[in-house]
Amino acid sequence: MSNTNNIQEEWTEMVEEMNNAVADSMEQNMKAQAAFVESWADAVEDTIPKEEDLADGMDGYNRAYEEWIDAAEQMVERSTDAAQGEDVDPAEFRDIWLQSANEAFKHVMGTSAFAAANGQLVESMMEMQQEADDLSQDALEQMGFPTRNDVDEVAERLIELERRQHAVEQKLDRVLEHLEE
């Protein structure tokens, strides 16, 4: 009977260890998922425009749309005038569209949404430029060419040597002056 109890205890112990392993695994999985969601939320949070920027952007687009509608109405009016025999200069049509395009772009580009998007674009471009620069420096280093850091270091050393040389020349001049007296 003690053998049966022993087997039962071993079985219970093994099941308990398995349960603990599963619980530990689930806990680690939950922590990993939470870390992923937090990381994802942090990354996405910066890309979502603020509500006031979004509203300002929509307002700008609406004003731009109104400019285009006004231009279309002016075009219809001038086309009707031309059809009725009035002498309409073709440059007038071009001017209507150019003026309305300028006004529409002002409405859109003057919004905080446009400024925010432009800022993100510039930031992304600067990051890409830095990454490309880092890659080119790594490639130069791997090929045995001097990198920007190497050239900067040599330049600093050269400047220091020139400074020291100048100091030695000044001391030598003082010694020579003293000897000539």
Swiss-Prot record:
Pfam families according to UniProt: PHA_synth_III_E
Enzyme Commission (EC) number: 2.3.1.-
Keywords associated with the record: Acyltransferase, PHA biosynthesis, PHB biosynthesis, Transferase
Keyword Acyltransferase annotated: yes
Technological use: PHB and PHBV are desirable bioplastic due to their biodegradability, biocompatibility, and mechanical properties. However, PHBV has better mechanical properties than PHB.
Outcome of gene disruption: Depletion of both phaC and phaE genes leads to complete loss of the PHA synthase activity.
Transmembrane annotation, as ranges: none
Protein's GO biological process: poly(3-hydroxyalkanoate) biosynthetic process; poly-hydroxybutyrate biosynthetic process
One Gene Ontology molecular-function label: acyltransferase activity
Leading EC class: transferase
Keyword Acyltransferase: yes
Summary of the function given for this chain in its UniProt record: Involved in the production of polyhydroxyalkonic acids (PHAs), which are water-insoluble biopolymers used as intracellular energy reserve material when cells grow under conditions of nutrient limitation. PHAs are composed primarily of 3-hydroxybutyric acid (3HB) and 3-hydroxyvaleric acid (3HV). Required for the production of poly-beta-hydroxybutyrate (PHB) and poly(beta-hydroxybutyrate-co-beta-hydroxyvalerate) (PHBV).
Assigned protein family: Belongs to the PHA/PHB synthase family.
Subunit structure, as described in the record: Heterodimer with PhaC.
Name under which the protein is recorded: Poly(3-hydroxyalkanoate) polymerase subunit PhaE
Organism: Haloarcula hispanica (strain ATCC 33960 / DSM 4426 / JCM 8911 / NBRC 102182 / NCIMB 2187 / VKM B-1755)
Gene: phaE
